[in-house]
Amino acid sequence: MHERLSDRHVLLLTDYDGTLADIAPTPAEATLSESVRLELATLAAFDDVTVGVVSGRRLDDVLDRVGPAAEYGAGLHGLEMVGPESAFHHYALDSVESVIARLARDAARELQWCPGVLLENKKYALTCHVRLAPPELGDRALEEFEALAEPQLEARTLKLLTGKQALELLPAVDWHKGRAAEWIRARVVPRVDRPVSIVYLGDDRTDEDAFTALGDEDVVIGVGDRPHTHLIDWRLAGPPSVGRFFARLADYRRGAAEET
């Protein structure tokens, strides 16, 4: 990997939940460890490294959690993005806001029978989490959640994403983390003096869209036991291993800078 990156500017893009932070019982409890935060900040300080976070969370939420190390951010799987002097808000978001609000009310009413169900209203997307529900009830709750949105799914107003013990509804547009990675790279390239290689870290099926969008000059790192794809160059066990990887990458970039 170091040979592949030796003469290139590194654009480090990473998912949040399950990659930077351990999966938690609720989204609010998923916090960045101080060790990972420190290593990420160390990398961001290098002139030849740019850091971005690409997440299914709302943009403001994930940027608040990662802090100033992330120069670029993509929320809602890339439907909203921001960087220095640039921002992106997909046109489809505003068209589904009222639909999501109505489905959130319907789901809260219809799924109240199931203990442990958590509905996460992201304004432009709605996620049903069943991590805290009894397994035999959680699967049924997810089926009912999907059924509530069937008219919008059939009309292609919304699409359904499958997560870890969760289902998510969001605008049915051809936009994903792969598009987000391309958008960010296109804005980094004019700002640096050498070719750009993306190092992308992700743990979920939605990250496969980014893996597919990357080229031979890029590095794909899977985190945890998912996703299962031949596109992965290396695999790390979890967020603690991600922190150690950041430390090794920083050591390499520091050594390369001293040699020049």
Regions found by a protein language model. Name each.
Residues 7-9, 48, 70, 123, ...:
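A general structural motif
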Residues 106, 120-200, 205-214, 218:
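Conserved acidic, metal-coordinating active-site core of Asp-based
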Residues 1-16, 20-24, 35, 186-190, ...:
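Non-catalytic pre-domain segments flanking phosphatase-related domains
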